[in-house]
Amino acid sequence: MHKVPRAIRAMGINAVRLYNRLEVSVAQPVPDEPVLFVCNHGFGGVIDLNVFAFAAAYDDLGLSREVIALTHQIAWTLRAGKLLEPFGARPAARENALDAFEEGHNVLVFPGGDLDALKSWRHRNEIVFAGRSGYARLAMEAGVPIVPVVTAGAGESLLVLSSGRRIAKALRLDKTAFRVKTLPLSVSIPWGVNVGVVGLLPYLPLPTKLQTSVLAPVRPEPDESAEDFAHRVHSAMQAELDELTKDRLPVIG
């Protein structure tokens, strides 16, 4: 990573450690081999506190391998992809992940995409992968373990009144170049009440407390299908998020 991206990354990490009072816990050391990190979204895409929380946790793990972050195609549609590539971002595609593993890198995915990233306040403590199992199939094909990483609190950095899935479906946004299934109605600083803006553009998050848990590595069982493997990973992640949020006070933590 070059000097400028490294400095921006460090600023983001410092922000979540200080402003968001980030706490990181690690269940087991990450094995010294390429792994697939599977994370949940907080709110937003690239501009998501969970991205910086993961970066902070990665530093705490003391790993030297580069991380390739598979990122929604919308970043390149909006001509922002080239700005993200110095940070390790690549379009979310199977070939890009396999190439990264072949080169000895770790790979980071957020399987829920915009469904998980732009969910409403009342669903903020739910991990929405919508039954997707491609990430599990990828890990099985590459022969790498999955390391789940769960972050709680980022969904309280603003107020999302609705995910706007019905509006997005009515507008057929998933059929456009943007390929999105949500158009959230939210209240944030400085945008106030808006539809669809926050998540694509930066906003000033509330000082919500973040907690990140790096779970133990997971490998498929003999004869386990990709769907069953994905279900097992998702269930473990949701159970951890439930534990992190069971006594939580919004924003305060």
Report residues per predicted region.
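Pocket-edge structural micro-motifs
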Residues: V26, C39, A56, T71, ...
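Non-catalytic C-terminal accessory region of glycerolipid acyltransferases
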Residues: M1-A7, D99-G253
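Helix-to-loop junction immediately C-terminal to a conserved catalytic motif
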Residues: M11-H41
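A generic local structural motif
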Residues: L22-S25, A55-A56, R94-E95, G199
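Catalytic core of membrane glycerolipid acyltransferases/transacylases, capturing the structured
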Residues: D32-A97, E103, G113-A130
